[in-house]
Amino acid sequence: MSKNWQDITLALAGIFQATHLVDQVARTGHLPPDAFKCSIESLLDLNPPDTLAVYGGDAANLRTGLEIMRELLRPSSSKYRETLRYGLGVLHLQKKLAGRRDMLGVIGSRIDQAAQQAETFGSTHDNVIANLGGLYSETISTFRYRIQVNGEYQYLQQTRIANQIRALLLAAIRSAMLWRQVGGNRWQLLFYRKQISWQVEDLLRRM
């Protein structure tokens, strides 16, 4: 069966965009609103018609993630180390989550509630983000393995930013689930880098 490398690449970009935003807000206290909105809304739509629809129907919404992937796929790249570390941690957590149907059920139900809340307040409203951050704490944070986020203490101690980080990690896990669903696996990151890199360049070129 042939792989849909574009779908695999889009889902990977979703992961790395969300984890880069985690690193960014942890270090600076700020988030680019459009990229943040894309990541959060990708989490809220659980029944999209196709992969691109998860990210608002436009690959340009994933420009940040695709540009990071372009750099990560270069030989001996040393940039975005924290983004990569968080991304690999997300893949590990998603694999753990896949074996917990009970937890998946809770997450699905709570995301439905958050989606309804977003219709009233907007997807990136503090109330919605607090709901999603709380969901991460009550579910994903109960696994033995946890992603340790590095950043400035003055930002990490703020409840609002802590909620944003947890909501973004949940969004990254959602993209990791999508990545698995469309045929993604970790071996591709080692042996099929050229196919993925070609898709990254093609998607960026068409923006």
From Swiss-Prot:
Stretches of the chain forming a coiled coil according to its record: none
UniProt xrefs under Pfam families: DUF489
Keywords per UniProt: Cell inner membrane, Cell membrane, Cytoplasm, Membrane
Membrane topology recorded in Swiss-Prot or TrEMBL: Peripheral membrane protein
SUPFAM superfamilies registered for this protein in UniProt: YcfC-like (SSF101322)
InterPro entries: HflD, HflD-like_sf
Localization per Swiss-Prot or TrEMBL: Cytoplasm; Cell inner membrane
NCBIfam families with a match to the protein in the record: PRK00218.1-2 (NF001246)
Family according to the record: Belongs to the HflD family.
Protein name: High frequency lysogenization protein HflD homolog
Organism from which the protein derives: Cellvibrio japonicus (strain Ueda107) (Pseudomonas fluorescens subsp. cellulosa)
Phylogenetic classification of the source organism: Bacteria, Pseudomonadati, Pseudomonadota, Gammaproteobacteria, Cellvibrionales
